């Protein structure tokens, strides 16, 4: 029975008993069985000896020996086998007499039996013991603390690795039913080992990483973590890589759990995309050349130094001046003179002969090159061009530089000036070639001048609010596309309906379905200019339905856009707090070296570990720099506080 029990356990299906305590239990069970069998054998041997002592004459046994001898003379092989069997029986009888002397008090407890039966039981017992010894030598189960000696610890009872990376290689469990118990803050989970082994780089999938959380007393892994989050973590292993956040778990808490269980950056990024956030851009590397690095920091990172902050202020002022000039030149007081100057520069003298204002402009020598607006525009373009060329020279990667949307905006804001300048020079060199060509050149110049309005987006390089707005719009492209699609369907539907509803009205404003597009857009967006309105009852009903549908259409995607805006706003706020903390920490000479290394290695990204951020903040508060700030901020302190502050200053002096 014991052999069957051991083989069943070693086949790989009973993995819930602690390995060390299971070995101890088996050892105690074997010891009890050995004592009970020895006592029974001693009792039977005593009874047999008593029967043989009262059996009469000694001829009986002598007769048996003669019979066996006669039989063995006819069969030599049988005689040899019988002699070996006789020797075995004699040896076992000696063991019986030895056990009888060890347990003389058990002779009255067991009934008498035949010698053959006793020998058969002893033979089975020895075979069982030999099989158990072979299994222990093969390493099917661990030894108990008695086998290890008095110096055995719980760490010795943990599953050992043979170096092959298999984890529990010394325990021959079957992969199909080897199970593991995981305790998360008192909530027990049970799964198969092969399920966790699908992701060997994670905390639960790597035997070496999870061993530190193993509890040998209960044969389970204990994690003092968030319990509701582990349902999704375990489902990640069971589903082969699908990570879904539980509804009752906040986003930041679940993100911390994903990082703790080391599911990987790819799983975290995929989870963030499923939650509706855009994939974060990788941190841009700095140039390797020290000179280029300093230039890049000056023009790209205004917060890096005071000169960089000054360059950013100059850039913002130039952008504002350019935008103001772009708006002022469209005033009627300046627009007429500027158009005449451009016409004179283009060679349109014949058209301006009858213009009363033309002679004084032409006689005064006004050209586009001495126009005040052109001069100010030239100064702004010189700065924009200088800034763009320097940043292009010092950038770490030319390919990434020209792919950046901000740099594309810089190019678009610079090109119109050079195109306009080239067109003016070509017109002066070629002279007037007809009114049609002049009209064409004026139209092109107006379009090119309109492109200059994109310079306002250059402010987003120095404005956190515009950056947050840009991130929000980019993260909400799916919702914005859905909103536009719904509006498109509504415009087509309601413009057609109002056209046919107003078709019989002679004074209607809706002469065609395309004419009704404007009314449908204005009504669905709840603007309602009133320039076009339905007159009939049917048209008014259609207008009412159009307004209600517009409210519902716009209201559905708006919460998602607002949620994205709140996320980017809070992320930027936390980023500013973390940057301020980092600057204060680096300037503190009394901060521990391990925390100082974290501060210096931390980037400007606000997606860092929140626990690490809190740890760094606590380190700053507990350092001598934090105590110094407390001492400076207090006016009326107790005697103990004054002594603490003086001691802190003394320590600073010693340092």
UniProtKB/Swiss-Prot annotation:
GO terms for cellular component: asymmetric synapse; axon; axon initial segment; cell surface; dendritic shaft; dendritic spine; glutamatergic synapse; membrane. The modification Phosphoserine is found at residues 123, 601. Residues 514-525, 526-533 dip into the membrane without crossing it. The chain crosses the membrane at residues 307-328, 373-394, 406-426, 442-462, 478-499, 541-569. Residues 81-90, 139-150, 631-642 have a biased composition (Basic and acidic residues). The keyword Cell membrane applies. One of its GO terms (molecular function) is monoatomic ion channel activity. It is found in: Cell membrane; Cell projection, Axon. InterPro entries: BTB/POZ_dom, Ion_trans_dom, K_chnl_volt-dep_Kv, K_chnl_volt-dep_Kv1, K_chnl_volt-dep_Kv1.4, K_chnl_volt-dep_Kv1.4_TID, K_chnl_volt-dep_Kv1.4_TID_sf, SKP1/BTB/POZ_sf. Detected in brain (at protein level). Heart and brain. Residues 91-100 have a biased composition (Basic residues). Residues 464-477 are annotated as: S4-S5 linker. It catalyses: K(+)(in) = K(+)(out). Glycans are attached at residue 354. One of its GO terms (biological process) is potassium ion transport. Residues 24-153, 631-655 are annotated as: Disordered. It is a multi-pass membrane protein. SUPFAM superfamilies: POZ domain, Voltage-gated potassium channels. A motif (Selectivity filter) lies at residues 526-531. Keywords: Cell membrane, Cell projection, Glycoprotein, Ion channel, Ion transport, Membrane, Phosphoprotein, Potassium, Potassium channel, Potassium transport, Transmembrane, Transmembrane helix, Transport, Voltage-gated channel. Voltage-gated potassium channel that mediates transmembrane potassium transport in excitable membranes. Forms tetrameric potassium-selective channels through which potassium ions pass in accordance with their electrochemical gradient. The channel alternates between opened and closed conformations in response to the voltage difference across the membrane. Belongs to the potassium channel family. A (Shaker) (TC 1.A.1.2) subfamily. Kv1.4/KCNA4 sub-subfamily. Homotetramer and heterotetramer of potassium channel proteins. Interacts with KCNAB1 and KCNAB2. Interacts with DLG1, DLG2 and DLG4 via their PDZ domains. Interacts with SIGMAR1. Part of a complex containing KCNA1, KCNAB1 and LGI1. Detected in a complex with KCNA1. Interacts with KCNA2. Interacts (via cytoplasmic N-terminal domain) with KCNRG. This is Potassium voltage-gated channel subfamily A member 4. It comes from Rattus norvegicus. The lineage of its organism: Eukaryota, Metazoa, Chordata, Craniata, Vertebrata.
């Amino acid at each position: 029975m014991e052999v069957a029990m051991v083989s069943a356990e070693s086949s790989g299906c009973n993995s819930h008993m602690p390995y060390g305590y299971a070995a101890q239990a088996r050892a105690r069970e074997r010891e009890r069985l050995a004592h009970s069998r020895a006592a029974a054998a001693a009792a039977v041997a005593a009874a047999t000896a008593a029967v043989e002592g009262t059996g009469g004459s000694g001829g009986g046994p002598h007769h048996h020996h003669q019979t066996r001898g006669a039989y063995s003379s006819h069969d030599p092989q049988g005689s040899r086998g019988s002699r070996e069997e006789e020797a075995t029986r004699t040896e076992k009888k000696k063991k019986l007499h030895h056990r009888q002397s060890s347990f003389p008090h058990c002779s009255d407890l067991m009934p008498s039996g035949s010698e053959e039966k006793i020998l058969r039981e002893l033979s089975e017992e020895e075979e069982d013991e030999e099989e158990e010894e072979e299994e222990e030598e093969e390493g099917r189960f661990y030894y108990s603390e008695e086998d290890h000696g008095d110096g055995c610890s719980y760490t010795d009872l943990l599953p050992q690795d043979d170096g092959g990376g298999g984890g529990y290689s010394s325990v021959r469990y079957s992969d199909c039913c080897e199970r593991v118990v995981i305790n998360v803050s008192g909530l027990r989970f049970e799964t198969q080992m092969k399920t966790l082994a699908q992701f060997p780089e994670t905390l639960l999938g790597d035997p070496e990483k999870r061993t530190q959380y193993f509890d040998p007393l209960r044969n389970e892994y204990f994690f003092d973590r968030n319990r509701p989050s582990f349902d999704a973590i375990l489902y990640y292993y069971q589903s082969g890589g699908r990570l879904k956040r539980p509804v009752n778990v906040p986003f930041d808490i679940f993100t911390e759990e994903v990082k703790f269980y080391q599911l990987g950056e790819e799983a975290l990024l995929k989870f963030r995309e499923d939650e509706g956030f855009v994939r974060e851009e990788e941190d841009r590397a700095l140039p390797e050349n020290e000179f280029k690095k300093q230039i890049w920091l000056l023009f790209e990172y205004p917060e890096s130094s005071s000169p960089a902050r000054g360059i950013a202020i100059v850039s913002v002022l130039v952008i504002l001046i350019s935008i103001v000039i772009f708006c002022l030149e469209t005033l009627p007081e300046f627009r007429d003179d500027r158009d005449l100057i451009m016409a004179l520069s283009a060679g349109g003298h014949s058209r301006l002969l009858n213009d009363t204002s033309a002679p004084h402009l032409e006689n005064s020598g006004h050209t586009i090159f001495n126009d005040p607006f052109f001069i100010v525009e030239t100064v702004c373009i010189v700065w924009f061009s200088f800034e763009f060329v320097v940043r292009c020279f010092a950038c770490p990667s030319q390919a990434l530089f020209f792919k950046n949307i901000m740099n594309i905006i810089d190019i678009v804001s610079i090109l119109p000036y050079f195109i306009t300048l080239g067109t003016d020079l070509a017109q002066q060199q070629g002279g007037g070639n007809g009114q049609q060509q002049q009209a064409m050149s004026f139209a092109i110049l107006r379009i090119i001048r309109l492109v200059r309005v994109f310079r306002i987006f250059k402010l987003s390089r120095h404005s956190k609010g515009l950056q947050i707005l840009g991130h929000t719009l980019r993260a909400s492209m799916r919702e914005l596309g859905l909103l536009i699609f719904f509006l498109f369907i509504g415009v087509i539907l309601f413009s057609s309906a109002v056209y046919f509803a107003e078709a019989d009205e002679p004074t209607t404003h809706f002469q065609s379905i395309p004419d009704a597009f404007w009314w449908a857009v204005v009504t669905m967006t709840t603007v309602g200019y009133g320039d076009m309105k339905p007159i009939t009852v049917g048209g008014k009903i259609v207008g009412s339905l159009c307004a209600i549908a517009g409210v519902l259409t716009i209201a559905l995607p708006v919460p998602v856009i607002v949620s994205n805006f709140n996320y980017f706003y809070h992320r930027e706020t936390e980023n500013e707090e973390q940057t301020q903390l980092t600057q204060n920490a680096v300037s503190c000479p009394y901060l521990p070296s391990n925390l100082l290394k974290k501060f210096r290695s931390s980037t400007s990204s606000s997606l860092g570990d929140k626990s690490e951020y809190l740890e760094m903040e606590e380190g700053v508060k507990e350092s001598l720099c934090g105590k110094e700030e407390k001492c400076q901020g207090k006016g009326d302190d107790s005697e103990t506080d004054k002594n603490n502050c003086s001691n802190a200053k003394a320590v600073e002096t010693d340092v």
